[in-house]
Amino acid sequence: MVFLFPTGTIIIWVLTILLAVIPWYLLNKFWLKPKRFEKLLKAQGLQGDPYKLSALFMNNSKQDYILKLQQEAESKSIGLSKQAAPSIFSSHHQTVHKYGKNSFLWEGTTPSVIITDPDQIKEVFDRIYDFPKQKLRSIAKYFSFGIIKYEGEKWAKHRKIVNPAFHLDKLKGMLPAFSHSCNEMISKWKGLLSADGTCEVDVWPFLQNLTCDVISRTAFGSSYAEGEKIFQLLKKQAFLLVTTLDKNIPLSLWWLLETTTKKRMKEIERDIRESLEGIIEKREKALKNGETTNDDLLGILLQSNHAENQGHGNSKSIGMTTQEMIDECKLFYLVGQETTSTLLVWTMVLLGRYPEWQARARQEVLQVFGNQNQNFEGLSQLKIVTMILYEVLRLYPPAIYFNRALQKDLKLGNLSLPAGTLVSLPIILIHQDNDIWGDDAKEFKPERFAEGIAKATKGQVSYFPFGWGPRICIGQNFALLEAKIAITSLLQNFSFELSPNYVHVPTTVPFFQPKYGASIILHKL
């Protein structure tokens, strides 16, 4: 027997069920679940602001307020002697200051547990499959690509294919390109000198162009001109992001970003993709025809990908797709350029403020190289320069924190963390923690690295400007080698000091960099 119900009755039943389910869903999502999180975390000794029902109506209001505070702080000079964390990392800094290191804060309805214990930090970095990266907001999709966004087997595959491009023997072959770009920048600065051999210059845009030039030469080699074009497009895209943030648009309204900006970003993305597709297709065709590939990053990447496919019966499903290779090339540019340029600019700022360390570094450089070009063996002997770079990275790491998102219930040390929790590693706070580094933790003291990183950290995972463990930044040796050559070239040609016009306002959009540039007075040697 078949029972037939009037359509009106069915609709009433559906509406009744929905009216029962939806309120329960909302109550659980915006109140019961966060309160369960809070109770569980506090039972383990973690402290933080209590979750409030206002999150139901103002899910991003606190983040918007924090962003506003940071932007207000970034409009004023904080002075070189003061810690940058309170102004650029106010949410975490305020939470730790108020509740101590065993604390948490809220990102909407999600608790973010602050991890500062070196043993727990090591565990997070080691257990890469248990602690995947947090998914980024939609606006960040234009700047999240390649190996940094992948997890699990896909990450492992890409890491295996990309890794050969950054082997030390390959980096040695890139030294001439590094030196060529540095010499061009030095020549430009010499052209700005007045009759008395001095000039004042904002070095920040020059250093950005330097690292762009290096990436263009080392990543694309013979395709340098096309590489330069791609960088300019990426730069425009980054500019659109930064100017959007400067407009104080609340995080909760980013999805309403004006159509013209979104349209332009999509157009730039298409142009970048088409340009890289053209370069990659030409190189792949040459590789299939048996032609010798260029020994640049793209050439090495294509060779490695080709070898991976051949090892599995020429199955293209095993290696990277063209789109994935495009993403890796974009990553070369964005991360490679920004990481090294920020390291160089803060090194110049700090050496400009501490002339005694500048003099010691110059003496070492002249003893090793005199006025000759650099070589790999000599760069390996630069102990003082290396100490300085390590200390700059401690005080001014490229990124100021890492977030990880739990997808299942996990134990972390003595903590039991539920699925859905965020784990936050506040790099800048850990790098300047008095309990780890001593009372001078916030001071510029390169001598702390005189016996290397392991000795300075007492074997703990408390220093990780490039990350740590299996997912440590694949390009860290590239960045440090480039930085050594640039600083060496600079010290061979100039002495320098901070200009009275320099305004110390660090910002973190998109990386830890000077908001108003870096005015330096150069003196020709």
From Swiss-Prot:
GO MF terms held by the record: heme binding; iron ion binding; monooxygenase activity; oxidoreductase activity, acting on paired donors, with incorporation or reduction of molecular oxygen
UniProt keyword terms in alphabetical order: Cholesterol metabolism, Heme, Iron, Lipid biosynthesis, Lipid metabolism, Membrane, Metal-binding, Monooxygenase, Oxidoreductase, Steroid biosynthesis, Steroid metabolism, Sterol metabolism, Transmembrane, Transmembrane helix
Topological type in the membrane: Single-pass membrane protein
Gene3D superfamilies: Cytochrome P450
GO BP annotation list: cholesterol metabolic process; saponin biosynthetic process; steroid biosynthetic process
Tissue: Mainly expressed in leaves and seed pods and, to a lower extent, in flowers and stems.
Transmembrane intervals: 2-22
Localisation: Membrane
Enzyme Commission identifier(s): 1.14.14.-
Record keyword Oxidoreductase present: yes
Positions contributing to heme binding: C473
Record keyword Transmembrane helix present: yes
Major enzyme class: oxidoreductase
Pathway in which the depicted protein is active: Steroid metabolism; cholesterol metabolism
InterPro entries: Cyt_P450, Cyt_P450_CS, Cyt_P450_E_grp-I, Cyt_P450_sf, Cytochrome_P450_Monooxygen
Superkingdom of origin: Eukaryota
Main location: membrane
This protein's GO CC annotations: membrane
Stated family: Belongs to the cytochrome P450 family.
Function: Involved in the biosynthesis of spiroketal steroid and saponin natural products from cholesterol such as diosgenin and analogs (e.g. furostanol and spirostanol), plant defense compounds used as main precursors for the industrial production of steroid hormones. During the 5,6-spiroketalization of cholesterol, may catalyze the 27-monohydroxylation of furostanol-type steroid to an intermediate product that undergoes a stereospecific formation of the terminal heterocycle to yield diosgenin.
UniProt-recorded name of the protein: Cytochrome P450 CYP72A613
